[in-house]
Every structure is written in C-alpha cells, then in structure tokens.
Amino acid sequence: MNILGIETSCDETSAAVLSDGTVRSNVVSSQRCHTDFGGVVPELASREHERLIVSIVEAAITEANIAKNDLDVIAATAGPGLIGAVMVGLCFAEGMAFALGKPFVPVNHVEAHIFSPFISDEPGHKSPDGDFVSLTVSGGHTLLSVVRQNLDYEVIGRTIDDAAGEAFDKTGKMLGLGYPAGPVIDRLARDGDPKFHRFPRALTSSSQTSKSYRGNFDFSFSGLKTSVRTWLEGHDAEFARQHQTDLAASIQDAIVSVLVEKTIAAALLHKVGAVSVAGGVSANSGLRSAMQAACNKHGLDLFIPKATYSTDNAAMIATMAQLMMARGRYRENSYGVAPFARFKAAGKGTR
C-alpha cells in the first residue's frame, strides 16, 4: 500500500510516500523567509506553502519511483497548527484524493509526532512491546502522555504557558542568537558550563512548589524567560557576551532537567517499560544525552526519532495514517474535515 503524506502545519512544506510501512521518500522544505522577523509570520507561511506544495508533492512521488495512480491513500495534517498553513496542505490533499478517487485520511499533527520514533525506513526497526510514556516537545507543544498499544493515550501533563521550544527560541533571541535559536543554544551549550547560573525549574521537586509536585506533570517556562531577561538587565553586555556559551548551557540545563525529571517520574508512576521523545526539541543533543542517561539508570527503553523525523515532516503523517487505518480509526469519506489550531486529544481518558 502506498500512502502519500502531506504536512504544512507551520513553516515546513513536506510530502512523503510510505510503501508497505517503509518510507520511500520524505521531501521537506524549511521556510527561511521568517528569519528577519524573529519568528514565524502566519501569512508568509501560508503563501510559501501555496508556492511550494505542488513541486514538493511531485518531488516526493518521483523520488519514491511511483506514479500518482499508484497511490492508495492520501493523508494530510488537519491540525493543530497555523490555520492558514494547515488549510493549504489539507485542501490540496483533499482535492488530490478526490481527483484520483482515493481515500483521504486527516491526521492529528501532535499524534503523528507521538508515533514518529517508530517511523520505519530500514529493516529491524524496533517499537515498544507495551505501553510507554511519550514526551512531545516542540516550539508549539510540550505534552506528556501515557500511550497504549491500541493508539489510545492519556495526556497527563502539558505546558501551562510557553512550550519548551519557544523557551529556547525566545531566550536565545535575548542573547542575540537570531531565529530559530534552539539549535544555536544546543551548539553553544556544548562548550559552556551548565552551572554558571542556576535558572528556575518551575513545577519540579526542586522548585518552591515542590509540595504540590507529586502527580503534577504540567510544565511552565515563562518564569525562565523572565529570569534570563532579569539576569541580562543586571549584567554588563560585554560580560554576557563573554559568557554566551555558559549562559546557553545554563538555559539548556534548566529546560532539559525539567523535561527529563517529569518524563522519568511519569514512567515510574505508570509502571511502563519505555519512554519516547518526539518533536523538534527531541533533536537537542543535551536532551537526548540526559534522557538516555536517566533511562539507563531506571532500566527504561528509550525511543527517539532520527533527526530527520524530529522536526515537522510528512513521513510521520503517512505513518500515522497507516496506524489509524490498521487499528480502525479511519472513517471512510473523510472529506470536508475542519482544520483546527489547537491540540485535540483523540485518545480515551485524555484531559
């Protein structure tokens, strides 16, 4: 079965072909037009998707060495994301499916991230044997979920203000690192001292709210942004520049330690044997290293997608569509689905 996946939820235009569960192509175009604005401009994102969508889809089909008529299913992100951006891919996919007489499957972008560590592009790819705890962490989302084998999942924690990826980008902008700042902080942090300054870790066992921590798996990163700004305002600009790597390491340590602590605590509380980390921030080397060390300490298996599949991509959309169809979560004639901006958990028992 050949599935075409299309992803346009934010600032990546992507199309991929999944053939019998294996990725045959995954074409991604990351928009550079937002750099000068210090963040994604929704209208520009939509226009870029419109400009690129045809060529990206054609490239994915060509790279997979198939014809359009060889496609069996068309899938696309229905949300969450920037509404205008989502609509470009969604409407294109619906129109293509209708024209070819193929089934159309709308996919929840966050659910696709949750299952992205299990994208198969080589033989022997492993998946958890049982339930697992998933940390989905990106510029727009920070979620902790307990995932069941039948695709049901329970969201047990989410950010109450800023997502972790947003915290990376905005604190990096304060340091003058440009946009996106997350990868730059990751690179600088490798040469810095994470103990240079201890920035706050909200809603953790080491924070002032520790009495209410037990069972609280929500996240908060707005205080970190305020703390970084306060530190910069209280120190000479030249001193801050000289210690840029130390500041990057300290910021990264504050974010990563919270993500790791809560994820491991959730895994132990729910007695699962595996943890997965997905989303754009899962590409962060500090997070990968710290999570692996924590999982090794507690005897947990760790699943993280390849860097190619960490950021937004269409291979995860096609993979999620295949999982939905295999487990009966696909409804025939899904045309006309309304795009949505905010995350809607589809699993049972979610909050």
From Swiss-Prot:
Q: Please give an example of a GO cellular component term from this record.
A: cytoplasm
Co-factor requirement:
Fe(2+)
Q: What class of enzyme is it?
A: transferase
Query: What terms describe the molecular function in GO for this protein?
Result: iron ion binding; N(6)-L-threonylcarbamoyladenine synthase activity
List the catalysed reactions: L-threonylcarbamoyladenylate + adenosine(37) in tRNA = N(6)-L-threonylcarbamoyladenosine(37) in tRNA + AMP + H(+)
Binding residues for substrate, per the UniProt record? T136, V137, S138, G139, G140, D169, G182, D186, N284
Q: Which CDD domains match?
A: ASKHA_NBD_TsaD_bac (cd24133)
What does the record note about the cofactor?
Binds 1 Fe(2+) ion per subunit.
Keywords associated with the record: Acyltransferase, Cytoplasm, Iron, Metal-binding, Transferase, tRNA processing
The protein's job, in short, is: Required for the formation of a threonylcarbamoyl group on adenosine at position 37 (t(6)A37) in tRNAs that read codons beginning with adenine. Is involved in the transfer of the threonylcarbamoyl moiety of threonylcarbamoyl-AMP (TC-AMP) to the N6 group of A37, together with TsaE and TsaB. TsaD likely plays a direct catalytic role in this reaction.
**What name does UniProt use for this protein?**
tRNA N6-adenosine threonylcarbamoyltransferase
Species assigned in the record: Chlorobaculum parvum (strain DSM 263 / NCIMB 8327)
